[in-house]
Swiss-Prot record:
Name of the protein in question: Elongation factor Ts
Family under the similarity heading: Belongs to the EF-Ts family.
Coiled coil ranges: none
Keyword check for Protein biosynthesis: yes
GO MF term set: translation elongation factor activity
Lineage per the UniProt record: Bacteria, Pseudomonadati, Campylobacterota, Epsilonproteobacteria, Campylobacterales
PANTHER family cross-referenced by the UniProt entry: ELONGATION FACTOR TS (PTHR11741), ELONGATION FACTOR TS, MITOCHONDRIAL (PTHR11741:SF0)
Keyword Cytoplasm: yes
Known function: Associates with the EF-Tu.GDP complex and induces the exchange of GDP to GTP. It remains bound to the aminoacyl-tRNA.EF-Tu.GTP complex up to the GTP hydrolysis stage on the ribosome.
Gene: tsf
Source species: Helicobacter hepaticus (strain ATCC 51449 / 3B1)
């Protein structure tokens, strides 16, 4: 397939930041399949992960409600067709009423709204009435609720532009830890809003996904190394592993044994090995978990202290409070996430309007 529409090349370029000719070649090689073209570019080290923000087509609002005692919280995403309507007072009232009913009833699916009523009117009818008033299609795309379990709290954050919202649930053992956990949860919510972790932990990344991402990540690092070499900059280490799930007990033991042999070869006194090894093992783990650092909340370095991962921040706070603090649930909504852009043929649209 040699005849590739310019619009498709442009869309691929926006999704990947790859060069125009690279995008065209990728589409030719994949016979115009956009998804396969993205993978082709990544495997060649010509693109980072496809940017979800560039696939967002919808407008609307993400709204978060949190209980005053932090015992529960809810999050909703409501889509409109235009940004103008998203700022409309009628639309804002619809969002507020929907958010309240989701929060009050701890709903966790958009379908469950159909059993609810607002002001004595079935929700579906209420929504249709507002669509008629506003003059645009309105969709309650997704909702979620979290209730604290035992000794625990839920906190949330919605970015001021209403495009990103986050909920985090924490558990702890001591009631005296509650205030500190409320504050920390809010701070980590803000981190997640900015850094976009896809999941809470590496345990949620499937083996096949990790292996596929490894090919792309290594190609990306090798491509960057070509430029670094030209500029005389230090090169990236090319990792053998990219996720904590790959670092089995046998892998860690083998690495520690290798480090011991290295220390012996360097003539380091055996008496100080145990002081050196923890730091070296920590660096090995950091160098071998690049995927976790990109995609998992617990594996990311904290924006407020980039020397520590979120997991290490929780460990430090646990030690400070003499408690065991854990994040047990994480939800992040970004407006329009995963909705493909509609590719418009402007000439065809004008022609249709003139008929």
């Amino acid at each position: 397939m040699a005849d590739i529409p310019a619009q498709l090349v442009k869309q691929l370029r926006e999704m990947t930041d790859a060069g125009m000719m690279d995008c065209k070649k990728a589409l030719v090689e994949t016979e115009g399949n956009l998804e396969k073209a993205v993978e082709y570019l990544r495997e060649k080290g010509l693109s980072k992960a496809a940017k979800k923000a560039d696939r967002i087509a919808s407008e609307g609002i993400v709204s978060v409600e949190v209980a005053n005692d932090f015992s529960k919280a809810s999050i909703i995403e409501i889509n409109s067709e235009t940004d103008f309507v998203a700022k409309n007072d009628t639309f804002k009232e619809l969002v507020a009423q929907t958010s309240k009913i989701v929060y009050d009833n701890a709903l966790s699916s958009a379908q469950s709204l159909h059993t609810m009523s607002i002001g004595g009117v079935k929700f579906e009818e209420y929504l249709q009435q507002n669509i008629a008033k506003i003059g645009e299609n309105i969709v309650v795309r997704r909702i979620a609720s979290i209730e604290a379990q035992g000794k625990g709290i839920v906190n949330g954050y919605v970015h001021s532009n209403g495009r990103v919202g986050v909920l985090i649930a924490m558990k702890f053992d001591k009631e005296s830890s509650k205030v500190a956990c409320v504050e920390l949860a809010k701070s980590i919510c803000m981190h997640a809003a900015a850094m976009k972790p896809q999941v809470l932990s590496y345990t949620q990344l499937e083996y096949e996904f990790i292996q596929k991402e490894k090919v792309a990540l290594i190609a990306e690092l090798q491509k960057e190394n070509e430029e670094f070499k030209r500029l005389g900059k230090p090169l990236h280490k090319i990792p053998q592993y990219i996720s904590r799930s790959e670092l089995t007990e046998s892998v860690l033991q083998a690495q520690e044994q290798k480090l011991r042999e290295d220390l012996k070869a360097q003539g380091k006194p055996e008496a100080i090995w145990d002081k050196i090894l923890p730091g070296q093992m920590e660096r090995f783990v950091a160098d071998s978990t690049l995927l976790d650092q990109r995609l998992t909340l617990l594996g990311q370095f904290y924006v407020m202290d980039d020397k520590k991962t979120i997991a290490q921040v929780l460990e430090a706070k646990s030690k400070e409070l003499g408690d065991e603090i854990e994040i047990i649930e994480y939800i992040r909504f970004e407006l329009g996430e995963g909705i493909e852009k509609k590719v418009e043929d402007f000439a065809a649209e004008v022609a249709a309007q003139m008929q």
